[in-house]
Amino acid sequence: MTIARTARTATTTTRIIHTPADMTQWIGRAEPFETARARYWYQLAQPYEAQHIGLIGFACDQGVRRNQGRIGARAAPPLIRRAFATLPVIADLQQRFDGQLSTLLGDAGDIHCDDNDGFAESTLEQAQIKYADAVSNVIKQGGLSIGLGGGHAIAYGSFLGLWQTLESQKNADVAPTIGIINFDAHLDIRQSDVATSGTPFRQIAEHLDAHDQPFHYCCIGVSRFSNTAALFDRAEQLGVQVISDEDCHYQPWDTLTDRVKNFVDQVDIIYLTIDMDCLPSSVVPGVSAPAAFGIELGFVERMVRTIMTSGKVKIADIAEINPTFDIDSRSCKVAARLLATMVEQHLLST
């Protein structure tokens, strides 16, 4: 990666910190003239203490910089939270968890990667490890960890957090199989001399291979104009199940959902990740790598709901929102809607 090698000539001072939840981000409208059922997520969120769901921010776009993308995604986590905070809590959840609403959602803070806008040796790797520790803490307490990126290098940190948890809970001869479902225009299995936002699933494949574990990876929304022939060759070698953006538009829903359900049936645990550049730039202008075509928001939301109802999703994340290029908070609002879909479906499926 030319940009990575060039950037190494400069010395960059870095800092990786895990900041606690900033509850001032959780604000919204008041409803003094409505009934108690006029509830919003900002009224339920608390600092994370073993709630059903733990939100963790990954305020890092060092991987995007290394991947020659446009930086700015590290500013996204608090803005996605704020957009989500203003959404109403649906009636089904209020009824099902009556008297227990404070147990639904916790904010576990943010992992900050301060790289002074330059290439920083090992900074991304340190941030991924610290993020993995936070993820593992949520999963070990029985919660669903949902990460808010940041660049898609969050994916390797998410996987490490899940792996760390499974290693600490080993009590059987056969390890549970992990399946990864990624909504993304890019395969993110690049070869590089450094980790980037374009390498996480290759890194995961290599990690699993080193531990004699299978690599189960389904990528939905892949664009033939966003991946080289070399990447498609590698996907075939790794046994990646590829569902293209054109498939998502032109193939019947039943055909596609059967493919995804068959994938889910083959594994014990699902890691679900959404790179927001899978959607058209007309819908989400604020991303690191905007898509000319993309897949429909309704399709993504419906498929996410299908995957979540399996009960196998133990970790999820949303990546690549870049507020620098957003318009009227449009992209953050779409991310918040998908976050709400994950949250609602997980809670209704428990």
Please give the residue ranges for each predicted region.
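Conserved alpha-helical scaffold segments that buttress catalytic/binding sites
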Residues: 2-350
